[in-house]
């Protein structure tokens, strides 16, 4: 009986060992592996809405256009710019702040110091720090009672508009990206440019 039990256990142990070895190193065999791509590339997961390659293309065009105008290129001192919110009038619930964020970082990087931006979105933290200095709670390298918060020379803002068509044949979306640089003193639009992108496809995609 002991010999018979041993003969049964050995094959079962070997089978379990082989199964365990076979399962090691197998990663998502039935799925599609993740592919790392550049932000300006279009992948196989795509829709007719605003995507990363659109954001890169549009903001790159706007940066080149802004830096070429006389108010920036020929300014005696670097103009100070404040970002105003981008209005989204398309059907896509996108993070519209990404446009301003990339515009600002690319302008700072490529302008060679010809433009400056104010961190108005951080005003609460800045005012708190200023008050702490005025109260003597923290050190100050200059007179904390002097008003040093700067005003803007220009506001940079934009609008996204769209037209959509949907039939049994598929979906089509046209998006107009328009941006403006507005003189903060006179309200004059000193610069404006736009980009147009149209896409069509068989299926619609969900955007978050």
Task: List each model region and its residues.
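A short, hydrophobic beta-strand-centered structural micro-motif
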Residues: 61-66, 80-85, 137-166
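Solvent-exposed, acidic/flexible segments
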Residues: 48-59, 92-100, 139, 168-172
